[in-house]
Curated annotation (Swiss-Prot):
Annotated organism of origin: Haemophilus influenzae (strain PittEE)
Gene Ontology cellular-component terms listed: cytosol
Signal peptide, first to last residue: none
Function: Involved in iron-sulfur (Fe-S) cluster assembly. May act as a regulator of Fe-S biogenesis.
PROSITE patterns, sorted: FRATAXIN_1, FRATAXIN_2
Cystine crosslinks: none
Name this protein carries in UniProt: Iron-sulfur cluster assembly protein CyaY
Keywords for the protein's UniProt record, in alphabetical order: Iron, Metal-binding
Domain of life: Bacteria
SUPFAM superfamilies, per database record: Frataxin/Nqo15-like
Listed InterPro entries: CyaY, Frataxin/CyaY, Frataxin/CyaY_sf, Frataxin_CS
Length: 101
């Protein structure tokens, strides 16, 4: 994956997150500033998802901790094999929103 594809892929992830959270009625605010996408929940807690361009990785930080994902075989996967979307759903639940992706 080249740099342009990396950015396009992550921006697609961010767009999907924002659209699905809205469609599912989640009480959140989403904001993008540069390479950082922040989801603020009704209880004022946050999930932060950011691009790590030098490593071509997607990072997520939440109440559950920090996780790093690389794009492998068409999806974002951590070193231990966890899929990004599974991690994201678990993180949302930890912040008080039950969503499906």
């Amino acid at each position: 994956m080249n740099i342009a594809e990396f950015h396009q892929n992550i921006e697609h992830v961010w767009q999907k997150i924002e659209e699905e959270l809205e469609n599912q009625g989640a009480d959140v605010d989403c904001e993008t500033q540069g390479s950082v996408f922040t989801i603020t929940f009704d209880n004022r807690t946050q999930i932060v998802i950011n691009k790590q361009e030098p490593l071509l990785e997607l990072w997520i930080a939440s109440k559950l901790g920090g996780f790093h994902f690389a794009f492998k075989n068409g999806e974002w996967v951590s070193n231990d094999g966890q899929r990004f979307w599974d991690c994201f759903v678990e993180a949302c639940a930890a912040h008080g929103e039950n969503v499906q992706f």
